[in-house]
């Protein structure tokens, strides 16, 4: 069974599980009479604090009803730091075409502290606020508590970065909410098919120029705010029907406060320009870096 057919099967199970309780013939059922089915849970939105929810103004597609059910439709991507799941959040029985009744979300769930991101975390976290000494020691010892602390910290760091960049107008998925080690965000794709990464895209020369200008514009938006992605590459840039969207953002750095900030910004420039150069589009990493440094220090 391929991924798409698996997602379709999960969606069919979710519809079957919820159609009867919320159908027209069952309108008299009390809310308490309904229970989520397999691969489902009640929407976690009502349980989150205001600070754990995405910034205002919120998009009209956002589902905030306490009657909504979250259904896991399948795994989209397994990564080194986290797994990405496709979630449908919907109010069963409500017209799906009406904004606020149903939407697809990406659930990024951080796994553990044994991988690349956590091992190199000090590079990115210098200049950030301090943690409790107990937490610092636990993370350094890689105890079970320390691993959990690290997972939660990176989830909240990604949510904070997405929220900040959304407010700046940068092209990133809208952050819906964060809870423990899970970040729920806008799903970027066509239907249930995730948008391809830049590394998978083959474009015309004009198309490549447009993609580069979008990416440079994204980097410029961050630089104006004194920030850098910190790990930018063709693998964490999605191309959604011609629009570039940046993902994987827990390591966003304050270029000035972090001693490694300008080095990380330079690496971002090199990674981007190397890919475009391989596609036979002229791109000067040093020129891009100099321009962005000027934006940071302006």
Q: PLM ranges: what are they?
A:
Residues 231, 235-237:
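Catalytic-loop signature of eukaryotic-like protein kinases
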Residues 2-74:
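Juxta-kinase regulatory segment immediately upstream of eukaryotic protein kinase catalytic domains
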Residues 48-194, 220, 224:
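Conserved ATP-binding subdomain of kinase catalytic cores across diverse folds
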